[in-house]
Amino acid sequence: MLKIFEKIFGSKHDKDIKKIQPVIQRINELQLSFQSLSDDGLKEMGLQLRSTARGALRPLEEKKQELLSKLSTPDIPLEEADRINDELDTLSEEYEKATVSVLEEILPDTFALVKDTCRRLKGHVYTVMGHDMTWDMVPYDVQLIGGMVLHSGRISEMATGEGKTLVSTLPIFLNALTGRGVHVVTVNDYLAQRDKEWMTPVFEYHGLSVGVILNTMHPFERREQYRCDITYGTNNEFGFDYLRDNMAGSVEEMVQRDFYFAIVDEVDSVLIDEARTPLIISGPVPNADNSKFQEIKPWIDQLVRNQQQLVASYLTDAEKILKTKPGDFDAGLALLRVKRGQPKNSRFIKMLSQQGLAKLVQGTENEFLKDNASRMHEVDDELFYAVDEKAGTIDLTDKGRDFLSRLSHQDSDIFLLPDVGSEIAIIESNASLSAAEKVKQKDAVYRLFADRSERLHNISQLLKAFSLFERDDEYVVQDGKVMIVDEFTGRILPGRRYSDGLHQAIEAKENVRIEGETQTMATITIQNFFRLYKKLAGMTGTAETEASEFYEIYKLDVVVIPTNRPIVRKDMDDLVYKTRREKYNAVVEKVEELQKKGQPVLVGTASVEVSETLSRMLRGKRIAHSVLNAKQHDREAEIVAAAGQKGAVTIATNMAGRGTDIKLGSGVRELGGLFILGSERHESRRIDRQLRGRAGRQGDPGESVFFVSLEDELMRLFGSERVISVMDRLGHEEGDVIEHTMITKSIERAQKKVEEQNFAIRKRLLEYDDVLNQQRDVIYTRRKNGLQKERLTSDIFDLLRDYCDMVVKKYEKAFDPEELEERLLRELSVEFRPESGLFDREGAKGIADKLYETALAFYSRKEKEIPEEIMGQIEKYAVLSVIDKKWREHLREIDSLREGINLRAYGQKDPLLEYKQEAFRLFVVLLQEIELETLSLAFKLFPVNPDEAREIEARQKKEALRQEKLVAQHQAAESIYQHIEESGTSNADNAGDNGPQTVIAEKKPGRNDLCPCGSGKKYKNCHGQQP
């Protein structure tokens, strides 16, 4: 129905392009007129446009500086400060409107200027990443359209080879004229450096400065790069610099400016694929015990082996029953226990390809899932532990607990959590206990709960490491280290770590050195970081399938830009086989056929393991080929460059999907162009589209097809029953293949199901983080205020006034002069001894006023004794150190709250609502503690004598060394959104790792580690070289 309407009225994309066409015509007319100008004349035109843009904004900038100057006056009244802040808010809105207005006015001239600059640069030879490059690019009309879409704050979807990098220069140039700074976000350091060097000639021709932020840069270098008109960098670098700026000890340490305009390259990768993993700065946990996994690993090792033997016996039982009674319920139950006990068992996966068995297992599972899975325990009780592969959770059964207690020679109760509420109630009701004894017994209960919950958590993580994470799939082991493989790109993520003890569990499993734990010090999600920008835009080859998410989360519209030349690539229906073995044999046969013909083929794989399996099979057939995966990625540029040559065979993980351009060799067009052969479907349609997009660039011929088997991960977990039943009905023999549009559509529906589930995770992540985001804004605003002011005396006095009122109010009902005197001496070092009867004579307000005057007099004496500069440092230290310390503690409490909040679903409560209420209560307490401790420190802190100063300096150096060990963490939201769809069901307590695990990016790689820039070289031979 929708397609009929589009044919009659035109699609949304057609209408978007139609609106832009008149401006494109105007740009081309202007560019023709600019051709008559001399080079100096064109540069003069650029200066005029810059002058127009900055001239329109200058009066508002001057007004802002004037207001900020008034606001920084030391003793400005509170009412005046509020009025100025309101005026600044209004001015900010006017400033944004003025920016939009002036840029719309000069857009046609600026785009025409950039186009003519590109024309004049043709033939210009310069260096990009150490290689000579000749400029040969002038924007086409479709690229001008893409540039206008980006400038308007939307997403421009452009096919591979359509020149997205050149398109970006148009809106970058236009917005850089304001002097407010434009950020260009790429997926790795290598692309940031390459794109900066590649496009710099256009910008420098007109005097615009261009910078790049790289992982290895020091803060002073970063500050210089951010001061440029245009700054390239990765989303991680921009995000971590934001967090580091909000941990800075002085204004001079801050590196970033305001967030004005960001253009995100490969926007779907950055804003969607990585949006499940927040950015986190973390530091080492003091006194962390890393031996706990080594202690329990032998038990888990034995437990897993016993489970494997048990599963094997169930498989044998099922086979026996099926020989005489096909479709028998007992056989289905035995196979269901195998699925719950060891879902990745190869013998089980092979059995499922037999006619009717997949349907039997599904039917049996549905029977036990009825009534909120109330009977599923009948299946699981016979196992040592139950695995829910789809949700990523593992649950230890009573049988498993008994086995572990016998193995560890301990009571099985140690694997059960005590009911803290009931235990505390019993202690409270015991009249024979004194208050001190009650406190002691309560502490013992809390300690017992903490010890047991930690042990159970470690057991769960080790079981996950053994059952759900496979070497050469989710991770590889290199140089004695566990290295995570990015599921979307197939690249190794140097220095990143899973969180929540999972990485340590995998290290224990692989018998490598177990690294230390970390704790969160600052965090922000990708979504909330990019919301800081006044204007956001993005470009990619694959955004349309996620258009609704882009709009709902970021308010970004997607516009599909027409190609310069029609795409003639042939996309064929999927070829479906029963087993992986049949599929791999068919892949090898197809590759052999294509190589004999001379047509180059790119075989896309989803994991390192599959790429190596296919490579072994091709070697067996003596077919020459290249392999590009996380283990061999150091030859990436060389392999990709040769992939389009005649007879080339290239096996690649998803690495070859982005940032690569495969050009065809001579004679290849006549053979049909590059052949894309996908060895399985990815869970995201976008990744498959990226792979197909490697062929058919700029009107080149090409072909693409996916080979799929029912044993593939996607089909096993989410495959439609319809596909299985069709295979069964047709009674296919071994090696037979199904090729039908209906099958392809069923597979795409399975992918859509996964995408919807992942969207739910990201949306839930945002709902939870929005709570923390509001709190973060308040804390960072207070911190910035403390950082920028020379003196904070008026802020201290405001806190003092509130403190005096609060303290006196507490003693209003039961006035205790001695306790009040002791408290003031302890908290402020102020002596204040109220006489008896003072409360009756003066009342609460009178006493509060006297207390305020006494404390004020104390502070005034302190100000006279201490030089003003030192006094300013004391106030600043009091504010910043307390905020930093308390915010770290608050983040730890919020993490703990998130971990257990889904259990509230048992009480028929909405976990999100409960989380909001609890987080607000914690935040109110946080603000009260910050105010009290800041005031206390400002009053009690005095300069030290020279000996003490030297001791403090030594401590500060030690602290500085500790700070250097800070690690930047890219953390997945697993602990918050455990089992999102089922948080209200009986599985809520199994809160799972639905979605990616937490990842931690360490601050600096080792000399022999892979360089994080993506070049493929070792760090010591790349960005780690000494200057």
From Swiss-Prot:
Where on this chain does Zn(2+) bind?
C1011, C1013, C1022, H1023
Localization: Cell inner membrane; Cytoplasm
Record's subunit section: Monomer and homodimer. Part of the essential Sec protein translocation apparatus which comprises SecA, SecYEG and auxiliary proteins SecDF. Other proteins may also be involved.
Task: Give GO cellular component annotations, separated by semicolons.
Answer: cell envelope Sec protein transport complex; cytosol; plasma membrane
Specify the protein name. Protein translocase subunit SecA
- For ATP, which residues are the binding ones? Q143, G161, E162, G163, K164, T165, D661
Annotated gene: secA
Q: How is the cofactor bound?
A: May bind 1 zinc ion per subunit.
